[in-house]
């Protein structure tokens, strides 16, 4: 090894090939990158995926329709509520079931709280990845409060299994609404403080502004979705543009990157779009709690679900963008085909192109700004 190192140092060309992962704190899961460097400059960073592949889609074809719901939690364990809803919507469309209004409102409330919890992990770990540890703990502290609220609602803190085909599993527990509103009052102040201390910190801004810029047309061509797409200046949100559930009844803005401190589509824009989205999610939860209708929380669904032969697509706007389930029924009690379309996979695809010419340290910022979660890649 010593001879190899000396030989490389003596050469004018300092090219090296490194394995960045698969167990590295900055990869946010078991993901590996084959990194080619010339000194401190990246020539290429090629994603090497498959370390967390568990055949989730195939399992969806081996178990009954309701039996697959707990597995959807594992598609994105940081924001599991959205995978529940996407799959439920697809099966409901196969069954031609109308979900009760109260259940739709409860779905929106649970998903928006889950979005805040996921974004807190994203922005917190991003600050940590580029060198500041304490802000991450502030984000985790707020996320723990949300976990407590979701645990009171559905009994779980991470893999919720709350949404059901036809509705939701549980109604609001007594006093839960007031606890959520109390948290949101505190959380709005926390966001303002976080912006003052971190987001608008001169050192932090200089570290992320103009780094790993993804132009809007390139983001579209690569199929980026969610905050990664909107961070590049593309104004698209499934909740508004392809409305589902209770979302047509709520007023909210869709934050879009515009070069807040640098270039539209840079790492800071992707980061700050998520900060702004948390404030919008807070608005949606307040509106949903104020207008929550009375009624049933689940539709009448047959115990043995056998949809007519056909196909359906369930789309939701998850914390990582458009999450879609494509389900084909052959008339039996098991799906013929289940396909999940996630945002993290396309985000991984763009890394090789964008990473060329970056500094090695900027690869960490790029991965964090894309908010990649390993199980969404390996399905």
Swiss-Prot record:
The record's keywords, sorted A to Z, are: Cell inner membrane, Cell membrane, Membrane, NAD, Quinone, Translocase, Transport, Ubiquinone
Q: Which domain of life is it from?
A: Bacteria
Q: Which GO terms describe its cellular component?
A: plasma membrane
Q: Which family does it belong to?
A: Belongs to the complex I 49 kDa subunit family.
Q: Which gene encodes it?
A: nuoD2
The EC code for this enzyme is 7.1.1.-
Q: What is its main location?
A: membrane
Q: Where in the cell is it found?
A: Cell inner membrane
KW Ribonucleoprotein (keyword) present: no
Q: What is this protein called?
A: NADH-quinone oxidoreductase subunit D 2
Family matches, as Gene3D superfamilies: Cytochrome-c3 Hydrogenase, chain B (1.10.645.10)
Q: Which topology term describes how it sits in the membrane?
A: Peripheral membrane protein
Function statement: NDH-1 shuttles electrons from NADH, via FMN and iron-sulfur (Fe-S) centers, to quinones in the respiratory chain. The immediate electron acceptor for the enzyme in this species is believed to be ubiquinone. Couples the redox reaction to proton translocation (for every two electrons transferred, four hydrogen ions are translocated across the cytoplasmic membrane), and thus conserves the redox energy in a proton gradient.
Task: Give the enzyme class.
Answer: translocase
| GO MF annotation list | NAD binding; NADH:ubiquinone reductase (non-electrogenic) activity; quinone binding
Reactions that this protein is recorded to catalyse: a quinone + NADH + 5 H(+)(in) = a quinol + NAD(+) + 4 H(+)(out)
Assembly description: NDH-1 is composed of 14 different subunits. Subunits NuoB, C, D, E, F, and G constitute the peripheral sector of the complex.
